[in-house]
Amino acid sequence: MLCAVYKSSRKADTYLFVNKRDCFDDVPQALLDMFGVPQLVMVFPIAKRESLGIADIQKVRAALEEKGFYLQIPPPQVNLLAEHRVSLGIKD
């Protein structure tokens, strides 16, 4: 099975995986509206891959089979200053 990956034109580090290039039939319209104009990043055979950057390959495969798409959002940013302040016992 081929997988097409698109990056969001509105949200940084947000990617949409779909089963077929330029086929967004299974993606909810509300998600596409939030995502903006999809920009193709790559197309690859997902069956031959063992890993995918920060995405869990098993979750991507399962989502593609069940829903027809997978949305990868960036992990939350860590506020190092806030963590350091807490470690020092400083409260806001």
Curated annotation (Swiss-Prot):
It holds the Pfam family YcgL. Residues 1-85 form the YcgL domain. Gene3D superfamilies: YcgL domain (3.10.510.20). Disulfide bonds: none annotated. InterPro entries: YcgL-like_sf, YcgL_dom. This is YcgL domain-containing protein Shewmr4_2172. It comes from Shewanella sp. (strain MR-4). The lineage of its organism: Bacteria, Pseudomonadati, Pseudomonadota, Gammaproteobacteria, Alteromonadales.
